[in-house]
Amino acid sequence: MIKQPLAACILALAFAGVHSAALAATPKETVAAFHEALTNGDKDRALAFLSPTVAIYEAGYVERSRDEYAQHHLGGDMEFARTTTRKLLKQNERIDGDTAIVWEETETTGTSRGKPVHAFGTDTMVLEKKGDGWAIVHVHWSSRKA
């Protein structure tokens, strides 16, 4: 019967779509998709771009895994991203084999928890090649008031 192989093919394509949606083709695309997921409040998609052992540095604090980030700052980061506008001022990328670094300069404006926001930021992300895509293994966020 044709129905069974067709159903299996559709199911396989659906799973392949989930994988390709989670890992973007280039380091820059991965970083952009991660920020887009934060802005859209898509927790599962944002976490899919992070290695399970990601290290996130922000304001002197360290989160040592994807699970720790999910339990602590992810919700606040999504809320902040939804209520502010992040403008990319400059972005660079360096790829060396299965490792890449993306560093950015940003300007963020808007409101967060009822207070005005205007800040300049510097972001550095280290990524590792995973199959056809990239996973974020380290994030360092830093910002200052404008």
Model region roles, listed by residue range:
Residues H35-D42, L50-V54, E58, H73, ...:
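Sec/Tat-exported extracytoplasmic proteins
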Residues L50, G60, E104-T108, D123, ...:
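A mature extracytoplasmic/lumenal domain signature
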Residues V62-E63, P116-F120:
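Short, mixed charged/polar active-site loops
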Residues I2, C9-L13, G17-T53, D67:
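Short, low-complexity N-terminal intrinsically disordered segments enriched in polar/charged residues
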Residues A55, Q71-K115:
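Surface-exposed, charged secondary-structure patches
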Residues Y57, T109-T111, E128, S142:
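A generic structural motif
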Residues E29-T30, T85-K87, T122:
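Short, conserved clusters of charged catalytic residues that mark active-site
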Residues F120-A146:
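Short beta-strand edge/turn micro-motifs at domain boundaries
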